[in-house]
Amino acid sequence: MSATFTLGQLAERLGATLRGAEAKVITGLATLQEARPEQLSFLANAQYRKFLAQTQAGAVLLSAADAEGYAGDALIVANPYLAYAQLSHLFDRKPKAAPGIHATAQVADDAQVDPSASVGPYAVIESGARIGAEVSIGAHCVVGARSVIGDGGWLAPRVTLYHDVQIGKRVVIQSGAVIGGEGFGFANEKGVWQKIAQIGGVTIGDDVEIGANTTIDRGALSDTLIGNGVKLDNQIMIAHNVQVGDNTAMAGCCGISGSTKIGKNCMIAGGVGMVGHIEVCDNVFVTGMTMVTRSITEPGAYSSGTAMQPAGEWKKSAARIRQLDEMAKRLRELEKQLAAVTQTANVSSDA
């Protein structure tokens, strides 16, 4: 059953200025284009302002500036997107598991599971693992030996934690994620690869979110480290001994090579690749599909590659790129010739 709240209740939760009917009932959230009269919407991006006048939403989360041009009911806040984020949890229909261990789950005798935790069907909790208060472990999850999940954690079905993985409090991990797999470590002897045991672990801070099918490898010696408040999207690959600083966010399909250190409050857009053994300082924004091949020591935005253009124009640009080396040689030769002519002219003038 959907949750219901009055506009007055929502305004009180947000500390918002209510303009409209306090008793109006709201049953959900939706976009400006799709909202129905019983739903609340929001305007947080100027490109969607064109939909405001025609929206059927029962009320809209608006900044004071946008509220001036809107005649309907509104909750006026400083940051509509943040307000939407705060209210979204009220209408989240995600099933909540009941405390207890399912009859089909396999829990080692020496594992510790808090009575308030939930362990789903066919989950496996190995020897020495510790599960904190109000943790939810979905069906078919594996929690490896000596691994720890802090209070309030939530694992979707089919999450795998290898041995010696330390998870902080209120961590969310989506299906298919694998934490603590062996890092890619090999030594070459006369063309033959010799495996290096990966004897470190993974340590993850509090309030971290890890997306579906993301992998975080265990350290070769010391732990791979993920700081507090880090947000990792789907299908990200974090190699062994990477360090990600507090409150850094990383979008899907990024690949971070071994022993690279990423600072705090960074934003790494989708498809970014980073080579190993480099450092990225705090407060860096890396745009999508950028290849980071050296350390970044100054905050700011960084990009590589070329932006989209019509295929014909791109082919011409690519052809010119292949010609750059020859053009550079010709330019250097012309500069030499020009310098010689200039020197001769100067000598003649002096004479």
Curated annotation (Swiss-Prot):
**Job of this protein:** Catalyzes the N-acylation of UDP-3-O-acylglucosamine using 3-hydroxyacyl-ACP as the acyl donor. Is involved in the biosynthesis of lipid A, a phosphorylated glycolipid that anchors the lipopolysaccharide to the outer membrane of the cell.
Q: Pathway membership of this protein?
A: Bacterial outer membrane biogenesis; LPS lipid A biosynthesis
The EC number(s) attached to this protein equal 2.3.1.191
Choose one Gene Ontology CC annotation of this protein and give it. membrane
Q: Name one GO biological process term.
A: lipid A biosynthetic process
**HAMAP family attached here?**
LpxD
Record-linked Pfam families: Hexapep, LpxD
Give the matching InterPro entries. Hexapep, LpxD, Trimer_LpxA-like_sf, UDP_GlcNAc_AcTrfase_non-rep
**Protein name (Swiss-Prot/TrEMBL):** UDP-3-O-acylglucosamine N-acyltransferase
Quaternary data? Homotrimer.
PANTHER family according to UniProt: UDP-3-O-ACYLGLUCOSAMINE N-ACYLTRANSFERASE, UDP-3-O-ACYLGLUCOSAMINE N-ACYLTRANSFERASE 1, MITOCHONDRIAL-RELATED
Keyword Repeat in annotation = yes
Q: Which UniProt keywords apply?
A: Acyltransferase, Lipid A biosynthesis, Lipid biosynthesis, Lipid metabolism, Repeat, Transferase
Q: Which reactions is this enzyme annotated as catalysing?
A: a UDP-3-O-[(3R)-3-hydroxyacyl]-alpha-D-glucosamine + a (3R)-hydroxyacyl-[ACP] = a UDP-2-N,3-O-bis[(3R)-3-hydroxyacyl]-alpha-D-glucosamine + holo-[ACP] + H(+)
A Gene Ontology molecular function term for this protein is: N-acyltransferase activity
Where, by residue number, does the polypeptide cross the bilayer?
Answer: none
Q: Which family does it belong to?
A: Belongs to the transferase hexapeptide repeat family. LpxD subfamily.
Q: What is the originating organism of this protein?
A: Ectopseudomonas mendocina (strain ymp)
Active site residues per record: 240
